[in-house]
Amino acid sequence: MNVLILCTGNSCRSPMAQGFLQSFNENINVYSGGTAPAAQVNAKAVEVMKEVGIDISLHVPTHVNEYLCQEWDYVITVCGGAHKSCPIFTGNVHHHLHIGFD
C-alpha cells in the first residue's frame, strides 16, 4: 500500500503523521510532501516524536511535485493550506482524505 501525506511545509504535521503511520505497519510505504516545503524539519516535531520512540530527525522536506506521477492508494492532507492548494492527482489516487490539524 502506498500512502502520501501532504501539508504546507512538510516540516511538522506531515512528517509526524508519516512517522506514526509507518510505525503502525512497516509494510505500508508512507511518504510525505509539502506544497511549499521548509528548509528543514521542525526541531520541536523531532523532539516530540523522539519522546514516543519515533525518529524523524533525518526527514528532508520534499515538494509535492516529486510524487505527481506515482500511484497512491491514499493521499491524505493534514492542513487546510495543503487541502486547498495541493495538485489534482487524477487517475493515480484511489482515495483522497483530509484530516485537518490546523
Segments the model singles out, each with a brief description of its role:
Residues 83-102:
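Phosphate-binding/catalytic loops
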Residues 1-65:
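Conserved active-site segments centered on acidic
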Residues 11, 80-83:
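Short glycine-rich anion-binding loops that position phosphate/pyrophosphate groups of nucleotides
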Residues 32, 77, 97-100:
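Structural signal for conserved beta-strand scaffold positions within catalytic alpha/beta enzyme cores
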